[in-house]
């Protein structure tokens, strides 16, 4: 029997579908806030806010997670890297508004992303209360490594020929697909919730208007990068059959029709959720 894998996106087409039913049939890879509702076998995130949210939630102590530029630094360097010339009085006054972190405990390593503390404090001092209200847009995010630690940097993945690292700057969904191909080498990959487009004039995401996500009133995210990145993956792995799962395949909207840019790839096909149910007797 062909080795199957399920790659879960966060498009609204999967709303109401029980992902747990897939578990007996293959590994489940997901991205970003999927963990809030369902624990995949592996999770990938590429944006600072959601990466640190995932780590602070303890997910990396349960399953492998892959993050962008996830560089672990010895704990002894923390104070000097954080303060970087800022005086103690200023740090104490503003740090609580700026720093997002988990508990340090006895951690021996940490990962830090975000703005420069000195720069943020200078900005607050210059613009006063108005700027202090907006410091959430300029924060420092720190994750202290906890054991067991199953977090990895996407950069450390095997690069393709001509590439220096395993991170191509892709979005989270296609990045999770690449991680899955390297780690599992499936013969069939089912793309569930990778809607790419929207059913209407608003953003299509299960987690819209929640922390680290765009407001529900915003317009759709342009699909051009997702389409190009998945297309690259199809080209790199011609012996794997990719199946995009839609609610229907009747052309009622952009979500439920073939992707024109993928028409030259022979290893991508389309199916609906009822076909998926029948195929795996879900």
Question: Can you name each region flagged by the protein language model?
Answer:
Residues 1-282:
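Metal-ion/cofactor- or nucleotide/acyl-coenzyme-handling active-site neighborhoods
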